Amino acid sequence: MMKINMILSCMLLWLVSACTSQEVVEITVSPEVTNAGYIGNGAEWDPYDEAKAWGASISDKDWETLCKRLDFMKPQYIRCMINSPYRYYDSATGTYDKTRNIASISRLLKYCTERGITVMYGEYNPPVWDMKQDQKWVDMSVDYLNYLVNDLGFSCIKYFVIFNEPDG
C-alpha cells in the first residue's frame, strides 16, 4: 500500500510540475514582404460538370452554402477543371457546342470575377480518348476558353491548364 501511495504521489508531483509557468514568447508581425510572388491560398473548385448525369443540378441553397464558405475562406485563387464531354462536347453526337451546360461554370466564374479571384482553368482530359493528339480538341478547347474570357467576360481566368496530368 505504501508503495502505491508513493507511486501516486510521484505521479501527482510530476503532473503538477507540468503546470509551472513558462517563459513568455513574444511574436512580432512585420510589414516586410518576404515573398512578393506568393499568390495566396486557394482551392480546387470544379463546376459540377457531371451533376445532371447524376440526376440533378446543384440547388440554389447548395450554391449559397458554397459561396458563404468561400467568402469565409477568402481564396486568392481557384483551380477550376472541366470535363469536356459534360461541358462543350456531346460524345453521343460528336458535336461541339460552347453554350452546352454553361450555367454552373458561369456561376462559378462570375463569383470569382466579382471578387477578383484568380482562376487557373483547365480540362481533365480530351472529349474522347481518340482525340488525345487531335488538333480538333485543341481548337475546341481554345475556342471554349475564348468564349469564357472574351465573349462572356470572365476576366478572372489568368492561367490555362491544358491537361490534368502528364500524359493522362
Question: Model-derived features: where do they sit?
Answer:
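Non-catalytic accessory regions flanking glycosidase/transglycosidase catalytic cores in CAZymes
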Residues: 19-159, 168
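Bacterial N-terminal signal peptides
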Residues: 7-17
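Positively charged n-region of N-terminal signal peptides that target proteins for export
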Residues: 1-5
